[in-house]
């Protein structure tokens, strides 16, 4: 099931795109965002598995390549600098991140972790879970939440900060087959 996002979400995503980027748009829908990204980025590769969403599209920008396929089932090119995953109900976030890291991509625009807006996720090195003592966290596997701690230690700045982590309890559970 596909549905377009509001203009504020698209604009937030576009603000993260740089002219030198080679972008992989995973689940590109009707290409409305991919076409706009192609006006900014060096190259865009858009993958959408529903052919009906791609049919009858106006002429495409020259820097846009469209693939009708399941992004989980096809190889991705190396050289991707930025990926887009606007899929707020995505259940394969960790699999996508793992593949993006494998091809060298280090930045991801997504709404899959928090289910709203658009954030830029750094796919590079992240803090280990054991270093987080209190506050909001977002893991590379897609899990998010709040780690409670002593109320006296909670500050306004800490409430605004999101700890970007690896190996949260959900990751550890899946690694142990739980």
Residue spans for each PLM region:
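S-adenosyl-L-methionine
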Residues: 1-18
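Conserved class I S-adenosyl-L-methionine
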Residues: 20-29
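Conserved SAM-binding motif I beta-strand of class I
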Residues: 43-48
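Conserved SAM-binding loop
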Residues: 57-58
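Conserved SAM-binding strand-loop segment of SAM-dependent methyltransferases
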Residues: 62-71
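Conserved SAM/SAH-binding beta-strand->alpha-helix loop
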Residues: 50-52
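A short, conserved alpha-helix within the catalytic core of class I
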Residues: 90-104
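Conserved SAM-binding loop of SAM-dependent methyltransferases across substrates and taxa
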Residues: 30-40
């Amino acid at each position: 099931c596909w549905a377009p996002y509001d203009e504020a979400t698209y604009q937030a995503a576009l603000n993260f795109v740089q002219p030198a980027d080679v972008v992989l748009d995973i689940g590109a829908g009707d290409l409305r965002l991919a076409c706009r990204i192609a006006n900014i980025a060096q190259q865009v590769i858009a993958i959408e598995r529903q052919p009906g969403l791609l049919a009858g599209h106006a002429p495409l920008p020259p820097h846009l390549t469209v693939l009708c396929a399941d992004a989980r089932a096809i190889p991705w090119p190396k050289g991707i600098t930025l990926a887009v995953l606007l899929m707020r109900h995505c259940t394969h976030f960790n699999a996508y991140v793992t593949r993006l890291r494998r091809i060298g991509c280090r930045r991801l625009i997504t709404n899959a972790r928090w289910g709203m807006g658009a954030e830029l996720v750094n796919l590079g090195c992240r803090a280990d879970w054991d270093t987080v003592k209190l506050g909001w966290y977002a893991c590379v596997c897609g899990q998010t939440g709040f780690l409670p701690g002593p109320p006296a230690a909670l500050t306004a700045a800490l409430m605004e900060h999101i700890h970007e982590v690896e190996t949260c309890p959900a990751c550890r559970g899946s690694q142990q087959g739980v």
